[in-house]
A protein has these predicted regions:
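Active-site-proximal helix-loop elements at catalytic-domain edges
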Residues: 1-7, 134, 141
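Juxtamembrane boundary at the C-terminal end of a transmembrane helix
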Residues: 184-190
Length: 190
C-alpha cells in the first residue's frame, strides 16, 4: 500500500490546485526522500511562526518552568494560543489535503504518490503542536514523526488501507499523534 515511487504532480487545470497543495508548494518534488522534505518544510514554517509569536525564544524563556505551548495548572492541561493555532492549522491542512491527495492519487494512478507530502505536513505539525519552540526540541519532534511515519506501528498501517486521500492523510496524522505523545514525555524530563 505504501506506493511512493517518484513521479510528477498533476498539472491539468482542474488538478493544478491539488498538485500545488499536495506537494506542499513543491516540497514533495525534492529528492531524495520527498516525505522527509515535506516534514522539513513543515518544521521550518512552524519554527518561523514560533519566532514570530514567541519573540526572544532562543533558550532562556522556559528556565522558569513555564512552557510556551502548554502548562499544567489548577484547572488542568492548558495550551497556549500558538499550540491552538498549530492544531487549527492541522485541521485546515487535513481538510484541504484529503481532496487534494485524492485528486493527485487518481490523476497519477497510484494509491499513495510519493510527491504528495501534505500528509507529512499535517502529521509533523501535530507532533510540533506541544513542542518547545527551540531547535533541539523541534529536531527531536522531526525525528519522532519520521520514525513513526516510516515504521508505521499498529494501527497506523491499517489506516493506509482507507480509500483515497483518507488513507494518505490519516496514517500520517496517527504517526503525528504518536510523536506528540512521546515528545510530551520527553519534554517532561528534558
Amino acid at each position: 500500500m505504501n506506493d511512493r515511487p517518484s513521479s510528477t504532480p498533476a498539472t491539468g487545470k482542474k488538478t493544478l490546485w491539488a498538485g500545488v497543495v499536495g506537494t506542499f508548494f513543491g516540497a514533495g518534488l525534492l529528492k531524495p526522500g520527498p516525505g522527509t522534505w515535506g516534514s522539513v518544510a513543515a518544521l521550518l514554517l512552524w519554527m518561523s511562526g514560533a519566532l514570530l509569536f514567541h519573540p526572544g525564544t532562543s533558550y532562556g524563556w522556559w528556565a522558569s518552568g513555564v512552557h510556551p505551548n502548554y502548562a499544567w495548572s489548577d484547572s488542568g492541561f492548558v495550551l497556549t494560543s500558538y499550540a491552538l493555532a498549530t492544531l487549527c492549522a492541522v485541521i485546515i491542512v487535513t481538510a484541504i489535503g484529503i481532496p487534494a491527495a485524492t485528486r493527485v492519487a487518481e490523476e497519477s494512478g497510484r494509491e499513495d504518490p510519493g510527491h504528495v507530502v501534505i500528509d507529512e505536513v499535517a502529521g509533523q505539525w501535530l507532533t510540533l503542536a506541544i513542542c518547545r519552540p527551540d531547535w533541539p526540541h523541534a529536531l527531536v519532534a522531526l525525528a519522532l514523526f519520521r520514525l513513526f511515519d516510516i515504521t508505521k506501528p499498529w494501527p497506523i498501517r491499517k489506516l493506509e488501507a482507507l480509500p483515497g486521500g483518507w488513507g494518505i492523510m490519516l496514517d500520517d496524522l496517527a504517526a503525528g499523534l504518536y510523536g506528540l505523545v512521546v515528545l510530551l514525555v520527553i519534554q517532561h524530563w528534558w
